[in-house]
């Protein structure tokens, strides 16, 4: 963005090397580009690394995602799958103006504290998973922050209970491992509960 300004003074060759390294590093860290570099379609076949799935043999192909980098990962998968995608649900921390999805519903969940929209998204995911059968394929993209964004308390615990519990843990200085240990016991999604 301001490359020209940065290269207009000082050690120009040194600055160019540092900028080139920085740009390459950022490209490798970009979740959208990373997904696009490992996944593609060959006709009706989805290829991810060395794995292959013939989507013409699938009844439905679903995309589920959550996390702070989910926007970019889900957008890449949505784009790669195109018309093969039946439906997608992504829970993100912030919906960006550049987010473009064809068949994916995007929900803005709460992070670090759960919220109502994240709960609605989780209920949609559970309905989708419950309606699936062995002929359906789920592509799941998860990144950091997903345990907070996927707020879906088990029966007998309210969303407000989960918010209060998380808030107390955060204020007490609990780390992510301690917080996730508690979330696993009060969530219908976290800790493998969805699977």
Question: Model-found features: residue ranges?
Answer:
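N-terminal loops that bind phosphate or other acidic moieties
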Residues: 1-195
